[in-house]
Amino acid sequence: MRVAALISGGKDSCYNMMQCVAAGHQIVALANLRPAENQVGSDELDSYMYQTVGHHAIDLYAEAMALPLYRRTIRGKSVDTGPVYTKCEGDEVEDLYELLKLVKEKEEVEGISVGAILSDYQRVRVENVCKRLNLQPLAYLWQRNQEDLLQEMISSNIQAIIIKVAALGLDPDKHLGKPLDQMEPYLLELSKKYGVHVCGEGGEYETFTLDCPLFKKKIIVDSSEVVTHSADAFAPVAYLRFLELHLEDKVSPVPDNCRTSNDIHNS
């Protein structure tokens, strides 16, 4: 099936794309919703639906995958917040509808890759939009065990870094910019201590993917800055704002049986 992937830049939407490909689907385009540029604090939009931290790097993410990217500015708010969603003018869900409608028209997709794990709020709204557009939502991570998922993501070579922290035990100075594989033991510890969701499904943290097996090139962060959103003494909320990034060619590892003695000597 021809599939468009709804991406935030984070690990979940990336891993769900990998699951789509493993199931035989073809990712033909990427779709992303972003905050208005003129909005104060536009890096971090107060949205029930969308991750917006890291949105400045999404163009580079699409370039790394060598896929067309469709973007739309989030104009709506969280208006209909009930357990069942019905079409509601001025709701941010309608921005998703317009975005996916465009992608369907341009790319003739039949399915949408969605990285939702636990949020019924998100699932209900994505399903509503997909039903109205006659699209099949593909959510392979839905209600999976989060410890298993995190381990799988790391094992499958998703190179992601922490770009937002918002939980007890997560320190902006220590943890922002840290690779996910290095954070895994600590996240498991926080889960046991404080009930933190290890995949960040409670909004405890957010990530940005710099490389994965689907990328043709990898993203390098040249410079960034820490922005404090809320200086809470126990659970400060802060995020990483990317200032400069570039793409770099990926070097394929040389199999041992193809390496010369000189390669081995210099390794």
Swiss-Prot record:
Superkingdom of this protein's organism: Eukaryota
Key words, A-Z: ATP-binding, Ligase, Nucleotide-binding, Phosphoprotein
Short name of one Pfam family: Diphthami_syn_2
InterPro entries membership: Diphthami_syn_dom, DPH6/MJ0570, Rossmann-like_a/b/a_fold
Enzyme class: ligase
Pathway field: Protein modification; peptidyl-diphthamide biosynthesis
Keyword presence, Lipid biosynthesis: no
GO terms (BP aspect): protein histidyl modification to diphthamide
E.C. code: 6.3.1.14
Catalytic activities: diphthine-[translation elongation factor 2] + NH4(+) + ATP = diphthamide-[translation elongation factor 2] + AMP + diphosphate + H(+)
CDD domains per record: AANH_PF0828-like
Function, in words: Amidase that catalyzes the last step of diphthamide biosynthesis using ammonium and ATP. Diphthamide biosynthesis consists in the conversion of an L-histidine residue in the translation elongation factor eEF-2 (EEF2) to diphthamide.
PANTHER family referenced in this protein's UniProt entry, alphabetically: DIPHTHINE--AMMONIA LIGASE, DOMAIN OF UNKNOWN FUNCTION 71 DUF71 -CONTAINING PROTEIN
NCBIfam families associated with the record: MJ0570_dom
Family: Belongs to the Diphthine--ammonia ligase family.
Record protein name field: Diphthine--ammonia ligase
Source species of the chain: Bos taurus
